[in-house]
């Protein structure tokens, strides 16, 4: 049984941890380690348009910040799922374990699940701008 007194804090921890992960992957890896130009070049090297590298950077950076702040976390988490599905696709041939050479697909798939969990359970405690109830109701009926 879910403890309704503590559940908002569990959702808060999940939301913030997921947001920090997106921020780390965008700002640390894509901006400082690989650089934006290098990231775009990588996307081009795997047969995708190079501009996808910039789009993914901005999606992760903006989405991560919105998740940490708790601004419309449900739709933001759902909108970020395709980014991680794409990451899983890129790493698929490397095997399951993320510590494999060039990274496996386990971590991106886990983050897809975590993003879906945030989309389902909501922002939790300390959200600056929770998802409007009308949007949640519409989402639940879909």
Predicted features along the sequence, with ranges:
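Membrane-interface interhelical connector segments
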Residues: 31-47
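Extended, low-polarity transmembrane helix blocks
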Residues: 1-31, 50-58, 62, 68-142
């Amino acid at each position: 049984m879910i403890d309704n007194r503590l559940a908002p804090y569990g959702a808060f921890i999940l939301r913030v941890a997921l947001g920090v992960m997106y921020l780390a992957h965008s700002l640390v890896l894509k901006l400082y380690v690989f650089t934006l130009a290098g990231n775009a070049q990588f996307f081009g090297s795997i047969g995708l348009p190079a501009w996808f590298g910039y789009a993914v950077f901005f999606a992760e950076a903006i989405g991560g910040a919105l998740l940490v702040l708790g601004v419309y976390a449900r739709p933001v988490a759902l909108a970020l799922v395709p980014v991680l599905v794409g990451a899983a696709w890129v790493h698929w041939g490397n095997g399951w374990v993320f510590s494999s050479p060039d990274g496996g697909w386990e971590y991106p798939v886990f983050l897809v699940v975590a993003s879906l969990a945030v989309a389902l359970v909501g922002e939790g405690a300390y959200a600056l701008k929770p998802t409007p109830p009308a949007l949640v109701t519409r989402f639940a009926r879909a």
